[in-house]
Amino acid sequence: PLRLVGSEMCIRDRLKWVVMLAPLGLVFFLSARIHALKASTAQAVFWIYAALMGVSFAVILIQFTGASVARVFFITAGTFAAMSIWGYTTKKDLTGMGSFLFMGLIGIIIASVVNIFVGSSALQFGISVIGVLVFVGLTAYDTQNIKNEYAGHLDDETQGKLAISGALRLYLDFINLFIMLLQLFGDRR
């Protein structure tokens, strides 16, 4: 019986890593190959990615109370909508923000990897605060970029690929903003 329990735990641990890392692999695949894929194939990969994110998100959400998840979701939705509208309507060119926001994103990734080993709540707080700022900025930046990409008169296939690419970017902005806000304002169980 102990052997079986150990095997089940090992399988669960492996499954947890697959569920957590598979969406990341699909994001890299879709980002790198979107121009080589047909729009319909890219869309199918995007839907598979979204489904896997739903499964992996369950692992995160069970750590928080339902009320705090709902509260943070509405805060995220309002913030995302406001920044997306601003990015779409502003006359200011946000292109210059791109490299700064990308550097911030790289910093968040590096700090998050370090914090896996360090386990510092202060570092996690800093990552979350900076993450909110970066993903708020990326929401406006990506929205304006998508608008500008669509301004060119492109064929239907290219527009389909741009739609998937844009949806992926905004989806990632929303999900990551939600996670950062949940780290800051979510009530743990």
Where are these regions (language model features)?
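Single conserved hydrophobic/aromatic residue that forms the stacking wall/gate
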Residues: 1-6, 10-11
